[in-house]
From Swiss-Prot:
HAMAP family: Asna1_Get3 (MF_03112). This is ATPase GET3. Its EC number is 3.6.-.-. Coiled coil: none annotated. InterPro entries: Anion-transp_ATPase-like_dom, ATPase_ArsA/GET3, ATPase_ArsA/GET3_euk, P-loop_NTPase. The lineage of its organism: Eukaryota, Fungi, Dikarya, Basidiomycota, Ustilaginomycotina. It is an enzyme of class 3 (hydrolase). Zn(2+) binds at C273, C276.
Length: 332
């Protein structure tokens, strides 16, 4: 199939479909490091704020670039983005969330704290997954219309998306085990003169966490409620990583039907910049491959490399328009 034919049949090259889908609750933005994920997630959140009642943008990347992008300090509590009434942002770290949970349990009573710690490190990945569960409980209680996740680079993203099923299995196992061993552990604790909350408190906490995770897991697999926007640049490694990401998302049953390709060069025809022309040729090659592979099933959005950094609310607002109105390069 020629690339001209593919382009003819291609889906609309914008993210308008995401803005129109009012049932969406969770939006993930992810890809390889350095491809413009944060700029894309900020731009998407800005566009969503025009059509949805309330939008929350969350960074789960330990590098936390949201503060840099908007030029405003964000932390682990949702804060309104300057210049917006209905857009808030927060930067969280699943690893620190589990540590806080253990410390909180320690302060309530030694036995519960140490058991939480044992649980957290007994199964690989459960520490991060439990941190994720705490975050999701917090986020769900905030009642935003739509939540956009600016995720960590690809490997972390995929681990993050597997947390619900990892945690669901682990907590189900621990809940069952806890109910059989609970009375015996309680007796043992009282023999040692241990005070603090009983094991039932801990298992009730785990159970409530499991319920949240089960619900979130169901929502993540529902294309009416969740979708993933893949971000890449027109280079071999990035395209390869995007294909891997799409395959993994499919295996997790998470909907994905949009690719944002950033940093595209559009040199003027009479440009004397040989480097620009050579690079444009390379980019055209990979954009062609991308169109051939994905244009029938994905909305492919081509975003330009601008002469200035996209930082600050005004520049992000301008840049975000290209997500809904395709960029038209100057003809001269």
């Amino acid at each position: 199939m020629s690339s001209a034919a593919v382009v003819e049949d291609a889906l609309e090259p914008t993210l308008q479909n995401i803005l129109d889908q009012k049932t969406l609750k969770w939006l993930f933005v992810g890809g390889k490091g350095g491809v413009g994920k944060t700029t894309t997630s900020c731009s998407l959140a800005i566009q969503l704020s025009k059509v949805r009642e309330s939008v929350l943008l969350i960074s789960t990347d330990p590098a936390h670039n949201l503060s840099d992008a908007f030029g405003q300090k964000f932390g682990k509590e949702a804060t309104k983005v300057n210049g917006f009434d209905n857009l808030s942002a927060m930067e969280i770290d699943p690893n620190s969330s589990i540590q806080e949970m253990i410390e909180q349990s320690d302060s309530q009573g030694g036995a519960m704290g140490s058991m939480m710690q044992d649980l957290a490190f007994a199964i690989p990945g459960v520490d991060e997954a439990m941190g994720f569960a705490e975050i999701m409980k917090h986020v769900k209680s905030m009642e935003y219309s739509v939540i956009v996740f600016d995720t960590a680079p690809t490997g972390h993203t995929l681990r993050f998306l597997s947390f619900p099923s990892v945690l669901e299995k682990a907590l189900a196992k621990f809940s069952t085990l806890g109910r059989s061993l609970g009375p015996m552990l309680g007796q043992f604790q009282s023999m040692l003169g241990g005070g603090g909350p009983n094991q039932e408190d801990m298992f009730a906490k785990l159970e409530s966490m499991r319920e949240v995770i089960t619900e979130v897991n169901t929502q993540f697999k529902d294309p009416e409620k969740t979708t993933f926007v893949c971000v890449c640049i027109a280079e071999f490694l990035s395209l390869y990583e995007t294909e891997r990401l799409i395959q993994e998302l499919t295996s997790y049953e998470i909907d994905t039907h949009a690719i944002v390709c950033n940093q595209l060069l559009y040199p003027k025809k009479d440009s004397n910049c040989q480097h620009c022309r050579v690079r444009k040729q390379m980019q055209d090659k990979y954009v062609g491959e991308m169109m051939e592979l994905y244009a029938d099933d994905f909305h492919i959005v081509k975003m330009p490399l601008l002469t200035e950094e996209v930082r600050g609310t005004d520049k992000l607002k301008d840049f975000s328009n290209f997500l809904v109105t395709p960029y038209v390069p100057p003809t001269e």
